[in-house]
């Protein structure tokens, strides 16, 4: 079986809090988690966990977050074909009462076109 996923790479920061500060307030969250996100990225990692070596075309910046992502994709056996951007994309996720608010910081100014693949 072969699988190819195309999408946006996100570093997801999820935090649990009972209060969202405004203005000059500060507040300490109860818990947090950091993971890789984006629909295509999530699907590629799921396939890899199931023993299928997927191909993934997704954004990647040459910064520490992008290098961390590349390293983890390599560890999972994902054939990663990066679409270069200047900075990594982040999602800040705030779950509350079964719903979730999301703030995204995304660089979608691609430096290069889609890579040519021979798979």
Where do the PLM segments sit?
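Glycine-rich phosphate/adenosyl-contacting loop at the front of the ribokinase-like
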Residues: 1-57, 64
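Conserved N-terminal subdomain of the carbohydrate kinase-like
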Residues: 26-27, 34, 49-119
């Amino acid at each position: 079986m072969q699988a190819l996923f195309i999408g946006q790479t996100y570093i997801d920061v999820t935090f649990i809090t009972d209060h969202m500060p405004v203005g000059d307030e500060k507040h300490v969250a109860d818990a947090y988690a950091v993971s890789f996100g984006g629909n295509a990225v999530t699907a590629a990692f799921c396939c890899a966990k199931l023993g299928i070596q997927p191909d993934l075309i997704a954004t990647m910046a040459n910064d520490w977050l992008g290098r961390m992502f590349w390293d983890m994709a390599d560890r999972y056996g994902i054939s990663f074909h990066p679409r270069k951007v200047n900075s990594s994309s982040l999602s800040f996720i705030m779950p509350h009462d079964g719903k979730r608010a999301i703030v995204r910081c995304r660089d979608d100014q691609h430096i290069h076109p889609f890579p040519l693949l021979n798979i």
